[in-house]
Regions:
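Bacterial N-terminal signal peptides
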Residues: 6-16
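Positively charged n-region of N-terminal signal peptides that target proteins for export
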Residues: 1-5
Length: 231
C-alpha cells in the first residue's frame, strides 16, 4: 500500500496586555478620524447616514520551510502585508440594514507600513463602497419585511445590541524570530525518517509560521489590538 504523508508543525504563542506603540497610534488615529468623518458626512441626498461603523486592519508576516527525504526543498519568508475591512449599518439599533444578519463587510487594501494618509484614504474608499451596498441591502430588507411583517415577539428584538466602550491593546511577550538554520535542521532530520519506508512514495515535512496583528475600532468606542502567532 502506498501513502502520501505531510507533516505540519504548529506551536502557539500567546500575548500580553500593553500600551500602544507609535505604529498603533498611527493606525488607530487614521481609522478613527476616517470613521468619524464617514459617520458625520457620508450620505447621499434623501438617504440615511450610517449610525455604526467598524474598521479592522490586519497585518501579517509568514514563513514556510519544506523538506523531503533529508533535504530542504523550499524556504519562503514573506514581507509584511496588510488588509482592511469596513462594516457599516444604516438606520438605528432597533432596525438597521443588516440583511440575513450576516454582518457583511468590504475589503480595503492597506499599505505595508503604517501610513496615516494611505490608511485613511483606503478606509474612505472602502466606506464609500460599503455605504452604497448598505443602501441596497436596506431597501431589500425593508421590501421583504413589508411583505413578511415580523411577529409581535420578533418586533421587540433589536437588530443590534450596543456594547460598552472598551480599549484593549495586547502585545506579544516575546519577539517573533525566525531561526532559519534551526528550522531547516528540524525539517532535514524529520524528513530523513521516511527514507526507510519504501512503501511511502511521496512524503514531505513542512514547518509554517505566521505573525499577525489585528486592529479593530468602532463608533461604539471599541478599540482592540490582538497579536496572533504560531510557528
Amino acid at each position: 500500500m502506498k501513502y502520501i504523508l505531510s507533516i505540519i508543525l504548529f506551536f502557539l504563542l500567546a500575548g500580553s496586555l500593553s500600551a500602544q506603540n507609535e505604529q498603533d497610534q498611527v493606525i488607530f488615529k487614521a481609522m478613527q478620524d476616517e470613521m468619524q468623518r464617514s459617520k458625520e458626512q457620508l450620505m447621499l441626498p434623501g438617504m440615511q447616514k450610517p449610525y455604526y461603523l467598524s474598521y479592522t486592519l490586519g497585518r501579517t508576516h509568514q514563513f514556510e520551510v519544506v523538506g523531503a527525504l533529508g533535504g530542504v526543498t523550499n524556504f519562503y519568508e514573506s514581507p509584511w502585508s496588510a488588509v482592511g475591512g469596513v462594516q457599516m449599518f444604516l438606520g438605528d439599533y432597533d432596525h438597521n440594514n443588516d440583511i440575513n444578519y450576516v454582518c457583511a463587510s468590504v475589503q480595503a487594501g492597506m499599505p505595508e507600513q503604517a501610513d496615516y494618509d494611505v490608511i485613511r484614504r483606503n478606509f474612505w474608499l472602502g466606506s464609500d463602497a460599503m455605504y452604497k451596498w448598505s443602501l441596497q441591502a436596506g431597501a431589500m430588507k425593508d421590501a421583504y419585511l413589508k411583505a413578511n411583517p415580523k411577529t409581535a415577539e420578533e418586533a421587540v428584538v433589536k437588530d443590534q445590541q450596543k456594547v460598552d466602550a472598551v480599549t484593549r491593546i495586547e502585545e506579544p511577550k516575546n519577539a517573533y524570530t525566525i531561526d532559519r538554520v534551526k528550522l531547516e535542521n528540524i525539517v532535514e532530520e524529520l524528513s530523513a525518517i521516511f527514507k526507510d519506508y519504501k512503501d511511502i512514495y511521496d512524503s514531505s515535512v513542512a514547518i509554517t509560521g505566521q505573525e499577525m496583528e489585528v486592529y479593530k475600532s468602532t463608533t461604539d468606542g471599541v478599540v482592540l489590538k490582538e497579536p496572533l502567532r504560531y510557528a
